[in-house]
Amino acid sequence: MYKYIWILILIIFTGFTSCNKPPKFSDDDSLKIAFSTDTVAFDTVFTTIGSSTRQLMIYNNNEENLKISSIRLEGGNQSQFSINVDGLSGYKFSDLEIYSKDSIYVFVRVTVNPNDQNNPFFIEDRLIFETNNNEQTVTLTAYGQNANYIIANQEIKGFPKFKIIADSLQEVRWNAERPYVVYGYALINSYGTLVIEPGTQVHFHNGGGLWAYSDGQLRVEGTQENPVVFQGDRLEDFYADEPGQWDRIWLMEAREGHGHSIEHAIIKNGFIGIQAQCFEKTNRAPLNIHNTIIDNHTGIGIYTNLYHIKASNFVVSNCGNYAIALTGGGEYIFEQGTVANYWKKSTRTTPSLFFNNTYQNPFDGNLYAYNFNFEMNNCIMYGNQEEEFETEFHAGPDTTYIFNNSIIRTKRIDNDTNYYKCLFNVNPKFVNKELNYHLDTLSPAIGLGNPKYATGILQYDLDEVARGNNPDAGAYQYVPIVEE
């Protein structure tokens, strides 16, 4: 009996010792590792701001285990790239074991050093791998972009952190030489003016925005060829259509004769495109919006509170809440515009267009009702909700709204005096309802407009196509395709 027990113990011990034999690694120089790519490429990256992380996979497709004797950045510790190998950060790693049919993760980032160039510049490095005296490389590339950095340095209770970029009685101009990258809010102080010249690119970090305080002035002076663009500060392709990357353009009341103006701008991928609201007093100067696209905001495209707006040749598209919310009363004229809300990032339960005439005073907290007057001419207001128009008016003040020669998605057709020569719940037939709001061949918006609203600066559409005597509804005039 004891004899068999000792034999069993010996067998078990032999099994354990055989299991604990160290793995063997081949030194055959004909065996090589493989990679998921031969080049890790980054999109344009602002100097001093780190990039997102790229992933590189190392594969051992051989039947034998291998030992990578060295992984290193050719630029060493001076490289603008950084790597993380299996959870460890550094610029050089030694003796990494990779078993047969196994893999190793390598994560790569880049932080570009600033220089004196205005245009994007190319940087490059190499990852060098040595295995059994074989040297293999993976190229790392990126484009760096110098920028003007605006970093918030002041804070007042109840307001976001900000930096004054145009102080009282000061006119500041931003130009297109280098992009502007804003952390926090860039603030235009009372009686200050910011002029943004054609082609300027303004990028906001998460939560950042542009803020014109009471009696300050913003003038955006883009052109058809060189619009001014407001967007987030992540330049990778992944973020190109990602909403909610920054906060908003926030415009308080301007002084008479010095109203805000936005011409040829693209405002995209924020929380609110434009928030225009009275703060200390009733607005005395209109906000003029012309030839401007406001697209892809998680909240609202245009949000107002007791304001005066004239908007023309505009597109407001794809917003997670209202496309346009005009609240607290005010005076509004919208002409030759397209509101197209086909938001798909989340469930939208609000209409594209909302009106009310009540305003909560920020100082005494009381709710007040004000006059509300709205006019929409030669426009399209459509979306993927069955009801895209809602009002909430308190009795007392004058409240009027009228739509002329427009396409509207609504069931609120309860008063003929509010609508003149409009089409209801008729698909406007865009070229692409999510991406391209030009009119398709069979669009009912073709010829729907009234020529009296297409005069002056509105003789030409958002693409500077002449409308002639038969204008279409919306921001874009239909142009027939000429077959050769």
Predicted region positions:
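Extracellular interaction modules
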Residues: 134, 467-471
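C-terminal motif of bacterial Sec signal peptides marking the signal peptidase cleavage site
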Residues: 15-18
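Beta-strand/loop edge motif enriched in small/polar residues
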Residues: 20-25, 33-44, 49-50, 93-435, ...
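Short acidic/proline- and small/hydrophobic-mixed sequence motifs that coincide with surface turns
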Residues: 51-53, 63-68
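Asparagine-centered strand-capping/turn motif at beta-strand->loop junctions
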Residues: 58-62
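Sec-dependent N-terminal signal peptides
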Residues: 4-13
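Short, solvent-exposed loop/linker segments at beta-strand-coil boundaries, enriched for Pro/Gly
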Residues: 74-92
